[in-house]
C-alpha cells in the first residue's frame, strides 16, 4: 500500500511537471526543430528539449547517416533518414530550426551537412567540436548559431597545451601591437598560461585600453603592464627593453591593409620593416631569449608592397638569427635612429648625429650592446610564423560583408574567382604559441590551412546564414581587383619546400638563402630612402626581394629609363 502511494505521488509530480512544461511552451512561439545526429549528444539535446521550460523548439524529426537507426523512435521523435533526406523532411515537418548535434564530426563532414542545411533558410545552431566541450558537457546552452567558420571545412588546430604552458610560465612576455586583432588574442592566451609579466605595447591607446580592461576583469592576479609607443621610435623601444627585459617577444605590430599601403609604400617600409628591425635589435641588445615575428602568406611571391614588406621582415628575422648565432653584432648597421648612443649611462640623441663627429663605427657600438646583455645569455632565437587571412580581424572581409548585409547590400567582391586561405584568430594564435616551443632559430613556420576558399562562396554563405537569399534579397557586386591584389595566394615559395614538426598542421619552410651582409647594406639604404619618402622605394624593394613582382602598374613605381 505504501509503495503504491509513493509511486502515485511520484507519478503525479512527474505529470504535473511535464504538463507545466507543455503549458509554458504553448504560451511561447514554438519552433519546429530538426536534430542532426542520433548519437549520445543528439539524444541529450532531445531529452533537454522535451523537458526544458525555456526552450521554444519542438523536436519533430532526427537525421542520422547510420541506416541502422532509420525508422527508430527516440523519445517519441522519428529518425527519418540521412543527410540526403534533410530537404524533404524540412518541408514535410515545416521545420524552421535545425540543431547540429554531432560534436565528434570531422570538419569536412560538418561542412557538407551544413551546406545542405543552409539551403533551407532555417535557423542553424550547432554544438562546438568535442575539443571545445569542457568535460564533454553537452547541453542546449552550448548550442551556438552556425558561423561562417563552420562552413570552411577545416579541422581545428590541436596544440600541446602542456608544452605551451611550460614555455610561457614564469616568463616576462612583450607583445607589440598588443591591441590589434592578433595581438589582443595573443595577450588573452598568454594571460591564461601564468606568465611572470605580460607587457602590451601599442601605438593606439583605445585598443590597448580595451584589452587592458578585459584582461584585468578576467585575470585578477595577472602582472600586466600596458605601454603606449611606436616600434618606429628607437628610444621608446630601447627604454621598454631596458626597464622590463622581456624573455619572449611577439612582434605583431604592422601595417597590413594592402590597398592603403600601395599608395603609401614608404610607410609600409618604415613601420613594418624598420619597426621590425628596431624591435629585433633591442631584443638582441637586451638579451631576450626568443623573438617571434607574425608574418603572412602575402609574403610568398608578393605582388604588393605590404606582402613584400613582410618578406623583408622575414629576411630581417633570419639575418638577426644568423648574427645572433655567430655573435657578430658588429655587422648590424645603424638604421636611421635605430639605437641611441649611451653617454655617462644616459640615452642621448640620434647616433647618426654623433657618428661623423666622434668617428664612431658600428663595431664601437657593440661595447654598449654587450654590456646590457645577461652574462649567461646564449643568444636570441629569431623565428617567423606565417599564416593566411584571419576571420573577423580588423579590416577583413567578414566584418565588411556583415555591415553590407545589415545595410541591405550590395555585398562587394573584387572578383568571382578570387580565393584566400582562412583561419580563426584563436587558431592563428595557437599556432604562434606552439611554434615558439618548436623554435631553434631562423625558421619560418607555416600552417597547413587546408583548401583555399572562394570569397564569392564565403559571401553567399554569409548572406544565407543571415536569413537572406543571394542575388534575390541581397545583391552581389564585383568591383575588380584592387591595386596589388592577386587572385590566388600561396603558402610557400617553391624554393622553400617544407619540413614536418610534431604537429601535423605546422610545417617549417626551408629558407631561401641570401647574403646577410649584402642584405643589411641594402636595408640601410632602404631605411634612408623610406625616411626621405623616396619615389623609388618600390623599385628598391623589388631589387632586394627577387620574388616581388608588382601587379600591374604600381602607383608609386618609378621605372628605370
Task: Describe the role of every protein-language-model region.
Residues 17-135, 203-212, 217, 224-225, ...:
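A solvent-exposed beta-alpha-beta segment
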Residues 90, 94-96, 195-196, 241-250, ...:
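Proline-aspartate-enriched helix->loop->beta-strand connector
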Residues 135-136, 251, 255-314, 319-337, ...:
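Conserved Rossmann-fold NAD(P)-dependent oxidoreductase catalytic core, especially the SDR/UDP-sugar
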Residues 141-145, 149, 153-245, 344, ...:
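N-terminal Rossmann/SDR dinucleotide-binding element
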